[in-house]
C-alpha cells in the first residue's frame, strides 16, 4: 500500500514536471509555437504569396504601418504584433484563430486600419494581426441587386465595382474610400445615403463569420441572434468577418450638389447654423444638407500666423438644379443659393467629390481613384462624436465654434450631420445601432496634427470641447458611435470579476438598450471571451449563464 502510494505520487510528480516544462516552453515561445501550428494551414502550392510576417521580416514594418491611418499609433512605444497574417482565403483565418487559441495569443483584425483608437492593430498583451488586405473581392449580381464583399475591400472598391456593373446602383456606406468594409459595416456605417436607405448594417443580408472554434458560419448556420449582433454590434466581438452579402440600392443617374463657403463673423455664422439645426433633419430624404467648420492657418499682412475658420454648407440632392435652388430659396433663403453654386454630377462622381480626394473645382473625375488603397497624406488625429436631440442655444453655439480658435487645436474640424429621413422609421432594436428617431443631428469633433510630441496637447483640446458640450447633447446616457470608438468612455479590466458592470458604462452609450442582448449573444457564442479588447462585449460570468 505504501509502495503503491509512493509510486503514484512519484508518477504524478514526473507527469507534473513534464506538463510544467511543456507549458513553460509554450509560454516562452508563443511566436514559434504559433508559426509551427499555422504552417499546416499554408497551401503547398502557394509559393509567391507572402502570408506571414514576423518582426524579423524586412517587410514587417511596412506591412504594419501601411494601413495605420492614425499616426498617433506609429511610435516605437506602440505595442507591436508578434506576427502579421495576411490571409488569402478563409482557411488562413481559421488557422489563425485556432493557433492563437492554442498558444495563448490575442487576435486583432484589420480591414482598412481606420479604428480611431488603433484597436484593430494594437493590444496590450502578446497578439497576432489578421490583416485582410488580400481578401478584397467584390462580386456583383445585378439581377438580384446584391453583392458579396470580402471584409478586406475598401469602400472605394465597393463603390467602383458596383458602378462598373450598373451606374444606377450603389450602397449606403461612408465617404472615405480607404475605410475597410469589415469594420465599417459591422459598426453601423453611415454616409450620403443614410437618410434614404439607412446604414450599411441595415442593408446586410448575409455574412460569412469564422467563430471561436474556427467554423465558417453563414446567416442560416449562425442563427438570427448572432446575425443581428454583427450588424452594428462590432463583428470583432464574436469572430472574424470574412465577407458580407449586401443589398444594393437605387441611385439617380444624376444628382445635384453644392458646397458654399461662408466668410463671416461667428455671431453671424451662428444665425445660419441655428436655422440649419432646426430644419436640416426635417427635409425630405431626397435632400442631405450638412455643414462643417475647419481651421486654416494663414499669414496676415504683418507676416504673423493667424487662425481662421472656413465654414461650408454642403448638399446632395436627388433631383435637378432648378428644383434644388427653388427648395433652398423657399426653406433657407439666408444661404442665398444660386444656380451657379450648384453642380450636376453622376452618382459615382458625387461619391468622389465628397471623398476628399479631389478639390471643388475639379471638372473631370477619374473613378479609378477609388481603387487607391494608400489613402494619401496621413496625420495624427483624435475624434469624438455626439448626438443632438434639441437645438443648441445660439450663445452656446458661439462658444463651441470659438473653440476652433484656441491655441491647442492643431487643425480642428466640427461636422454637423443631419438625421431624419428613413432613420426615423427604423426601430432602435432592428440592429444593435440604436440612434434613430428623435435625433436631429450628430456632431463630429476632430483634431489632427503632425508632431507626435503634441499628442497630449491636442487630445486635451478635444476633451475640453467635449466636456463643454455636455449639457447640450444626448443625456442619460450620453450616446456614442462604435465606429468612432472612444476609450475615454471607459475600458474593461479583464482581471476584474466585474467585467459586465464596467462594460455597461460605455456599452449603453454605444448600444443603448441593445447592450444586454449583445451580452447574451456573446455569452452564448464566445463564453470564454477569446475575442476581446478594451471595449469588447463581455460574456456574463458562469453563474449567470
UniProtKB/Swiss-Prot annotation:
Per UniProt, what is one GO molecular function of this protein? oxidoreductase activity
- Residue numbers annotated as active site: 484 (proton acceptor)
Q: Where is the FAD-binding PCMH-type domain?
A: 77-251
Q: Where is this cross-link: 6-(S-cysteinyl)-8alpha-(pros-histidyl)-FAD (His-Cys)?
A: 114-176
Query: Which Pfam families does the UniProt record give?
Result: BBE, FAD_binding_4
Intrachain disulfide bonds? 37-99
Main location per UniProt? secreted
Question: What Gene Ontology terms describe where this protein resides (cellular component)?
Answer: extracellular region
Classification via InterPro entries: BBE, FAD-bd_PCMH, FAD-bd_PCMH-like_sf, FAD-bd_PCMH_sub1, FAD-bd_PCMH_sub2, Oxid_FAD_bind_N
Signal peptide from the UniProt entry: 1-28
Superkingdom in the source lineage: Eukaryota
Q: Provide the residue positions that the database annotates as binding substrate.
A: 292, 417
Asked if Signal is a keyword of the record, the answer is yes
Q: Which UniProt keywords apply?
A: Disulfide bond, FAD, Flavoprotein, Glycoprotein, Secreted, Signal
Cofactor(s) named in the record: FAD
Q: What function is annotated for this protein?
A: Has no cannabidiolic acid synthase activity.
Family membership: Belongs to the oxygen-dependent FAD-linked oxidoreductase family.
Q: What is this protein called?
A: Cannabidiolic acid synthase-like 1
Amino acid at each position: 500500500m505504501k509502495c503503491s502510494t509512493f509510486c503514484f505520487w512519484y508518477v504524478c510528480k514526473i507527469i507534473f514536471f513534464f506538463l510544467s516544462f511543456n507549458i513553460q516552453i509554450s509560454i516562452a515561445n508563443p511566436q514559434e509555437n504559433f508559426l509551427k501550428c499555422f504552417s499546416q494551414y499554408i497551401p503547398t502550392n502557394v509559393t509567391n504569396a507572402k502570408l506571414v510576417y514576423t518582426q524579423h521580416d524586412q517587410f514587417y514594418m511596412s506591412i504594419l504601418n501601411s494601413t495605420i491611418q492614425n499616426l498617433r499609433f506609429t511610435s516605437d512605444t506602440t505595442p507591436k504584433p508578434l506576427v502579421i497574417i495576411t490571409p488569402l482565403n478563409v482557411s488562413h483565418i481559421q488557422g489563425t484563430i485556432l493557433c492563437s487559441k492554442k498558444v495563448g495569443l490575442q487576435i486583432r483584425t484589420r480591414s482598412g486600419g481606420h479604428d480611431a483608437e488603433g484597436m484593430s492593430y494594437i493590444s496590450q498583451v502578446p497578439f497576432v494581426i489578421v490583416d485582410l488586405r488580400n481578401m478584397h473581392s467584390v462580386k456583383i449580381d445585378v439581377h438580384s441587386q446584391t453583392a458579396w464583399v470580402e471584409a478586406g475591400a475598401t469602400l472605394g472598391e465597393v463603390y467602383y465595382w458596383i458602378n462598373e456593373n450598373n451606374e444606377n446602383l450603389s450602397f449606403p456606406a461612408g465617404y472615405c474610400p480607404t475605410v475597410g468594409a469589415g469594420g465599417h459595416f459591422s459598426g453601423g456605417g453611415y454616409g450620403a445615403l443614410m437618410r434614404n436607405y439607412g446604414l450599411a448594417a441595415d442593408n446586410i443580408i448575409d455574412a460569412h463569420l469564422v467563430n471561436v472554434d474556427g467554423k465558417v458560419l453563414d446567416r442560416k448556420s449562425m442563427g438570427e441572434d448572432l446575425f443581428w449582433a454583427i450588424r452594428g454590434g462590432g463583428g470583432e466581438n464574436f469572430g472574424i468577418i470574412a465577407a458580407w452579402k449586401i443589398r444594393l440600392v437605387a441611385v439617380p443617374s444624376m444628382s445635384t450638389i453644392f458646397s458654399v463657403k461662408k466668410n463671416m463673423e461667428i455671431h453671424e455664422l451662428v444665425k445660419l447654423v441655428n436655422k440649419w439645426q432646426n430644419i436640416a433633419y426635417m427635409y425630405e430624404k431626397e435632400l442631405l444638407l450638412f455643414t462643417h467648420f475647419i481651421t486654416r492657418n494663414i499669414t496676415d499682412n504683418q507676416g504673423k500666423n493667424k487662425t481662421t475658420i472656413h465654414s461650408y454648407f454642403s448638399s446632395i440632392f436627388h433631383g435637378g438644379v432648378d428644383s434644388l435652388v427653388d427648395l433652398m430659396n423657399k426653406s433657407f433663403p439666408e444661404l442665398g443659393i444660386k444656380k451657379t453654386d450648384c453642380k450636376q454630377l453622376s452618382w459615382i462622381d458625387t461619391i468622389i467629390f465628397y471623398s476628399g480626394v479631389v478639390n471643388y473645382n475639379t471638372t473631370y473625375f477619374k473613378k479609378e481613384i477609388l481603387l487607391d488603397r494608400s489613402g494619401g497624406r496621413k496625420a495624427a488625429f483624435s475624434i469624438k462624436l455626439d448626438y443632438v436631440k434639441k437645438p443648441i442655444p445660439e450663445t452656446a453655439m458661439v462658444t463651441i465654434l470659438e473653440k476652433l480658435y484656441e491655441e491647442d487645436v492643431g487643425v480642428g474640424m466640427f461636422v454637423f450631420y443631419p438625421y431624419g429621413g428613413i432613420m426615423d422609421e427604423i426601430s432602435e432594436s432592428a440592429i444593435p445601432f440604436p440612434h434613430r428617431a428623435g435625433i436631429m443631428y450628430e456632431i463630429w469633433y476632430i483634431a489632427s496634427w503632425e508632431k507626435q510630441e503634441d499628442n497630449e496637447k491636442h487630445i486635451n483640446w478635444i476633451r475640453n470641447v467635449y466636456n463643454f458640450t455636455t449639457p447640450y447633447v444626448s443625456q442619460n446616457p450620453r450616446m456614442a458611435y462604435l465606429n468612432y470608438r472612444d476609450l475615454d468612455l471607459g475600458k474593461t479590466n479583464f482581471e476584474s470579476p466585474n467585467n459586465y458592470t464596467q462594460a455597461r458604462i460605455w456599452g449603453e452609450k454605444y448600444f443603448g438598450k441593445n447592450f444586454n442582448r449583445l451580452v447574451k449573444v456573446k455569452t452564448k457564442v464566445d463564453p470564454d471571451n477569446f475575442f476581446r479588447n478594451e471595449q469588447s462585449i463581455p460574456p456574463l460570468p458562469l453563474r449567470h449563464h
